[in-house]
């Protein structure tokens, strides 16, 4: 297994994993996520694959997409009260449900940390849905800590 940038022939594997993530989110928040949802379709994925600010890394297990990490490079300059900084935002990280427990997620995460350092980023950030306890535990074990918390008041 090795980590590499995604290619167009990885799209079917990416879509299968996006559906797995969509189901996890749907199970946690059916009031927000649609049934059988996926974050990106084939057209969007083709566009993302050409965007150098949005790298997608895959864990390639003998040609099978065993996991992915969608990233967004962000630069903040002259942003009011905040310091200038560069960040890599993890938009989505998923390991195939049948391949979990093999350290694939850690390999992806560590690869992304190295990539972010190479790009001059000071931070790696992400969001986790409340209730996604396994993701919270994974990121906490990887050394991440909360920066901010999004609050909501449900009105209906």
Model-derived features with residue positions:
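A short helix-loop-beta-strand connector motif used in the catalytic cores of GNAT acetyltransferases and
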Residues: 43-57, 89
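Conserved beta-strand in the GNAT
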Residues: 58, 64-73, 89, 94
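Conserved beta-strand-loop-alpha-helix junction that forms the acyl-donor binding cleft
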Residues: 125-135, 152-156
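Conserved active-site alpha-helix within GNAT-family acetyltransferase domains
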Residues: 106, 118, 130-148
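Conserved GNAT acetyl-CoA-binding A-motif
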Residues: 116-127
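Conserved acetyl-CoA-binding loop-helix of GNAT-fold acetyltransferases
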Residues: 92-95, 101-114, 141
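Conserved GNAT-fold acetyl-CoA-binding loop/helix
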Residues: 22-45
